[in-house]
């Protein structure tokens, strides 16, 4: 584990940029950026286009370590380069931004009010590749739609089982059990989720470090006590479908919670913008997300 990166993630002010749209969510991300689905005819062309978008974001002067602590990458992005450097190396060596890797393969069908992660059949190879490419940590997402205690327990059990394997390889896992912001019993789901997370944290080995990526809670500062747990490096929040302004407003009410936004970060960016317009739009978004993350 890179101690310099650990200190940066655990102590510094800023937020984590989520640039990890996968095959399923990439068309939506490109459409938001102004690239229609008829602009590409296969996955390779689609991933080339999204890498150009991510490269434009990462290389922007607005995307800098004053505001951004880390960036979460999609697996395909890890193998690609920016200015002849692998993306993770470019982020750390050129920008002082800590690289993370999304490792999940998407969600299973809804059962017991939740969607577990699909099996990660190539986990060992993926973690080996991540270490070779100088990745600091990983991220994996599950989804909670209903306050079903059995389902939520299954989600957290699966997350921590994987987190243990990841931490044993010297990487820092970001555990992401997202609660649906549209759920009618969101607050109850959050109570059940916190209970399960607390149980698992108390069972971890003394040296094991994890991060949590959670929906912005209904009750302000609901996760404050989890932040104090010695196993927890940082708790970050997903935007979860809120607009950037609403996500920022809700986030700012939660002290110590920092952003890890994806769609809300790239809101209002367009392929048709000049570099000046693009950089200005990105800069405004980054500064506003940063301000909401340092309360």
UniProtKB/Swiss-Prot annotation:
Keyword tags: Glycolysis, Lyase, Plasmid, Schiff base
Signal peptide from the UniProt entry: none
Entries under SUPFAM superfamilies matching the protein: Aldolase (SSF51569)
Enzyme class: lyase
Known EC number: 4.1.2.13
Pathway: Carbohydrate degradation; glycolysis; D-glyceraldehyde 3-phosphate and glycerone phosphate from D-glucose: step 4/4
Biological processes annotated in GO: glycolytic process
Location of the active site: 176, 213
Top-level taxon in the UniProt lineage: Bacteria
One GO molecular-function entry: fructose-bisphosphate aldolase activity
Entries under Pfam families matching the protein: Glycolytic (PF00274)
Catalytic reaction(s) noted: beta-D-fructose 1,6-bisphosphate = D-glyceraldehyde 3-phosphate + dihydroxyacetone phosphate
InterPro entries for this protein: Aldolase_TIM, FBA_I, FBA_I_Gram+-type
Family annotation (NCBIfam families): PRK05377.1 (NF003784)
Membership in a protein family: Belongs to the class I fructose-bisphosphate aldolase family.
Name listed for the protein in its UniProt record: Fructose-bisphosphate aldolase class 1
Organism in which the protein naturally occurs: Clostridium acetobutylicum (strain ATCC 824 / DSM 792 / JCM 1419 / IAM 19013 / LMG 5710 / NBRC 13948 / NRRL B-527 / VKM B-1787 / 2291 / W)
